[in-house]
Every structure is written in structure tokens, then in C-alpha cells.
């Protein structure tokens, strides 16, 4: 891929063709990937967090798998594998495919939270503060 990816205006929710270097049961090869890093990180880091998509619709009842219909701009009906986040260089990004609508991003966020269950360690009284910080990290910088 091209190093010009470091200058792209990447946003959480964007789907790109991505080269995954998986081994074993990990996703590998070129496939769609969902940018799942906050926008401040996307702007300043040479790396980003991506969730792989697959068109092999298996284990559809798993709470960490989110169905995405092809009508959002994909070639095939797909699933986001929320339990498989990958940190990778922006150089592994290929062409832009589409941006996931917010209704699906909400489902992906829940799937990702459930994949680690880390939310169980947060005091419920702090959840609003965490949510506000997340909103700030996704604000579009001008």
C-alpha cells in the first residue's frame, strides 16, 4: 500500500480494503476493514485500529459479530468481527469503500465492548464521563 495513507482524513466508521497479515485462525489477505480508532488517534498516529469484515456469515448469533448488509456499500453481505481488533500501519490501507451508518456503528461498539467485557470494571457513575471523553476524541478537528 502507499505511504500517502498517513495523510488521508481517516474517520472512525470508514471501511477500506485492508491487507491483514493474520496467522492461524486470524483474518488474512485483502478484505474490508472498519476503522475503529478514535478520530484524534486517526489524525495523529501512523497506526490505526481496524476491525476485519468477512462475507462468511458464520456464528451470526455471537454477540461480537455484527451483520452488515451489502446495501451500505459493500460487495456482499458481511459481518464485522468485533472480537478481532488489529493495530496496523496506515500503509496497509487500500481503497476507500464506504462509511458505516451510525445505526451499525452503535451495534459494532456494543459488540466490541462485549468482546473484552472491560466495561464491567467501570463504575456505573463514571460511564457518562467516559462517554463524554469518547465524544471529544471523535470530534472532527478543523
Regions found by a protein language model. Give the residues of each.
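C-terminal terminal-subdomain/extension
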Residues: 2-8, 72-142
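Short, charged beta-turn/beta-strand-edge "cap" motif at the junction between a beta-strand
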Residues: 21-24
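Compact nucleic-acid interaction/catalytic patches
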Residues: 26-30, 35-70
